[in-house]
Amino acid sequence: MNAVPLTLWDAFVQAAEAAPDRPALVFEEATVSFSALRKDAERIAQWLASARVGRGDVVAIQLPKRHVTYALWLACLRQGAIYVFLDPRNPPVRTASILKQLKPRVFLTVGDDENPFGETHRLDDSTAEGWLAALPAGGSSQPAPVHGLDPAYIMFTSGSTGEPKGAVIPQQGVLSLMAWVRRSIRPQGEARFSNINPLHFDNAVFDLYGGLLNGATLVPVETSDAANPLIWVKKLRAGRANVIFAVPTLFQTLQQLRLLSARSMPDARVFVFGGEGFPPAALKAFRAAFDDATRLVNVYGPTETSCICSSLEIDAAALAAAGEGFASLGRMHSGFDHLILDEDEMPVETGATGELWIGGANVGLGYVDNADETARRFRQNPTDTRFRSMWYRTGDLVREDRDGLLWFAGRVDNQVKVRGHRIELEEIDLALEALAGVTRAATVTRPGPDGPQLCAAYSASGPVSDETLRSHCMSRLPPYMRPERFLALDVLPQNANGKVNRKAVAALFRADN
């Protein structure tokens, strides 16, 4: 790819024109070339235009990983529309909450959910390809004239108020991410990126943009298959994926099954992981399982900063520096500014712990339909108020050493990571407290064989069975947010100011274990 793309659609067109016959998508049953994918995206873009979808309009996509899903995503980029991937496994009440915030002009779904704010189109495996084939050829209209600060997508994460919150990410942030991948990740020769990450999950941004829009082949693995390591390793081998991005929990599962090896994954050249800490002993075993030519890259970045803002190559020196602790988050990438501030929003000394604030072109535009949370998290640089400058308060506690390496030290709130998913524990508490009879709830994590487990303690006005609690959670929360254990208490432990003492609750679950 030669010229620097000005828009995300430009980037895809450059990739398609540079190698039209190169595989863009490799499924188990079929391969789709870049030229074919471009034609389909242009046909869908014409269909979107007929539905009055243009620059700045929202399109919600709740579909599995199919050829048509990727073409829809690209069609949104061509139209300048803001796309939003939704989890097909979401309970209806959660999907309804998200649609209420988005008010999409068009909603495409595999389920029974309805969009009261615009059109709803149902596309399942039996109808999707027929729908695509019936669309007329793409017209001669020009792509929408989008700009760097125009939103590209909205990504929903857990919210502490009980409702999910949608981070709005601009085109310029994603273009910057793509440039970093070209500089730092892309292997020599033909690049084939995995797409294990669910499309509604932050890490998929790396797969779609760092991979496909940079001209690499994408090897999708359906979310349901990602739960079965034997299946997804087989699919990655069949697709000859050589850049593989997943959360540490998935790689640890492969280790337990003795599948994380050069023999099982002979094409792998770069492993990328992030979203949660990689246990030190497991990371050392991972590094030892491959030769030095195979790269391991630890990445860090909140959803609100376009997926990735720092990284670290995991080699012998990185492991030695970490000792018995977690590896460093690496150094901040070019294009980012960062501050580490104390509780008074003043810079800390080198080596001291404080909250990480991130600035630069990759910072998002706020949260959709959520002015309060936007004002709380997206802030003016408190150390320099002369000029307007949007910074993101991560809530992550870090320290920076004299070499510029960042080290994670905890959270300032009750946000946790489970299998790479950001979870606000208060959202689970509020969901449980919505069940008749439950008077108070407190969710915590405890160590489990496959990473942190969610556990919920509660008080109730009468007996409530675990089965009732699980059924209630299934109706309100996505799978990754559902507690695995419940504990009934007469009164939840409290601290001096009357708030629930989560540390004491966590100790009860550790004792119960």
Predicted feature descriptions by range:
Residues V4, V13, D21-R52, A96, ...:
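Conserved AMP-binding/adenylate-forming core of the ANL superfamily
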Residues L63-R66, D87, P187, N197-A204, ...:
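Conserved AMP-binding
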Residues T7-W9, F107-A144, V174, R295-N298, ...:
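AMP-dependent adenylate-forming
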Residues L213-A216, A241-F245, Q255-E324, D337:
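Gly/Ser/Thr-rich phosphate-binding loop
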Residues K165-R192, D202-N242:
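Conserved AMP-binding/adenylation subdomain of ANL enzymes
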Residues S33-A36, A152-A179:
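Conserved AMP-binding A3 loop
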Residues A30, Q46-R89, N195-P198:
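Conserved AMP-binding/adenylate-forming
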Residues P20, G139-F156, E163, P187-F193, ...:
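Conserved pre-ATP/AMP-binding loop-to-beta segment of ANL
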